């Protein structure tokens, strides 16, 4: 991925920080990467994943304007867990619990301008046979607010700062 794409926005940086943290905390996971939207069975049939695998997705981002001209994003995130084999359900729950525990009240994923994770939940999605192998998919979902998206109009380089400051001799009578 080019440097331009990596620096394209805080939401992508946030997702990459979560992936880095999960890789560090769960070294037995063989494949950990990003996912666009929800993970489904059709994707599992077409993608070559080495289980156990985790795919991190931003499922929704609700943007709220802030007085500074910036935005704050209420992110709805999902870490999709893919496990295989006889013990796939047990493995799936173990990984889901580990990820959910990582979503503690002090978890900022190495970033700043971020709220604590909230509304953490685990949901089993499916356990089925695909291409003659048993596969389980579950998801850990949570919400987290990402602040200071965009430019602050009141910073030194801001466009409005000089327009908001007036001198006494500039005010007409």
Language-model-derived ranges and their functions:
Residues 39:
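Extracellular glycan-recognition surfaces and repeat-rich motifs
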């Amino acid at each position: 991925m080019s440097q331009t794409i990596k620096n394209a926005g805080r939401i992508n940086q946030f997702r990459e920080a979560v992936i880095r943290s999960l890789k560090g905390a769960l070294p037995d996971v063989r494949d950990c990467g990003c996912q666009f939207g929800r993970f489904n069975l059709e994707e599992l049939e077409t993608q070559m994943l080495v289980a156990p695998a985790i795919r991190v997705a931003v499922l929704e981002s609700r943007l709220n304007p802030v007085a500074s001209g910036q935005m704050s994003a209420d992110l709805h995130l999902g870490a999709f867990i893919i496990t295989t084999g006889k013990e796939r359900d047990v493995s799936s729950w173990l990984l889901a619990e580990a990820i959910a525990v990582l979503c503690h009240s002090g978890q900022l994923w190495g970033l700043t301008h971020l709220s604590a994770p909230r509304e953490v939940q685990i949901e089993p999605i499916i356990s089925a046979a695909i291409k003659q192998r048993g596969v389980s998919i579950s998801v850990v979902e949570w919400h987290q607010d990402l602040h200071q998206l965009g430019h602050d109009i009141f910073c030194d380089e801001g466009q409005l700062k000089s327009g908001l400051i007036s001198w006494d001799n500039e005010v007409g009578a």
